[in-house]
Amino acid sequence: MSNLELAPSVMRFYGETVNEDSRLRSSADGRMELVRTQELLRRFLPPAPARVLDVGGGTGIHAEWLVKDGYEVCLVDPVPRHVEAASAVCPAVVGDARDLPEPDDTFDVVQLLGPLYHLPDPADRQRALAEASRVAKPGGLVAAAAINRYASLFEHVTYAHLHTERIHNSVSKILETAVYDGSRGFTLSYFHRAEELVTELGASGLENVRVFGIEGPAWSLVKAAEQQPGEGPTDELIASAMDAARMAEPYPELLAASSHLLAVGTVPVGSAGRRP
């Protein structure tokens, strides 16, 4: 087990406060995030049965569909209750993205669909990406998700309270600093710009880095509809928002409107035994 520890507020948030599994299954924008993440990853995944390391994999919500697709999945997460739940899906251990308990050149795919969210120190993010690159095989895939720099701006409009002084000031600080201190509601978090994510993956030695908007530019319309009295967003609205996410992919200027970003890159061939 790693001696590194996440910020106590992050551990409390995921260990005691929030159910990350239900977030991606119950809310409309959460379901969009889950389906689009599957859709994007399946474009780049090698054929099953390849070996996948799910770093920060939570309760195994992504491991679950990967196992069903025929992949051999191992999961690492810092939160013990997540690991306990994920163990019903695949082998799972407590560990930290910055110090993975795995040998070099072991996995065909390493995915970090959460760890970068809660590492505001760039040195920590670089260490996590370097570890992902280390344990991936030459030619292997590394995929990393990030919260978009502007996500909170769109989100708090959907709740119709961005104009209140406290929320306005809080979101303004996130836009200025890219960091939320976790003082209320959400926990300590970092918010990426797309070009920054490309730079960070490249600095870890990855090649052919590409970034996608996961939910696309219309997710906040779906979330706003869900806040209104009644039955929530229609299937037609969700389908249109999903189509908008796909249509937006060729246009990098639309990345800033997505709630989350997904970056993919490959480990250079001939780099066995490296440690960035």
Predicted regions: what they are:
Residues M1-A48, I61, W65, A85, L141-I174:
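Conserved class I S-adenosyl-L-methionine
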Residues L53, G60-D99:
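Class I SAM-dependent methyltransferase SAM/SAH-binding core
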Residues R98-V110:
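A short acidic, Gly/Pro-enriched loop at the edge of an enzyme's catalytic core
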Residues V109-A123:
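A short SAM/SAH-binding and catalytic strip from SAM-dependent methyltransferases
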Residues Q126-L141:
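A short glycine-rich, Lys/Arg-flanked "PGG" loop and its adjoining helix->strand segment in the class I
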Residues L188-G205, V211:
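Short alpha-helix
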Residues S204, R210-P276:
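C-terminal lobe and adjacent flexible extensions of AdoMet/dcAdoMet transferase-like proteins
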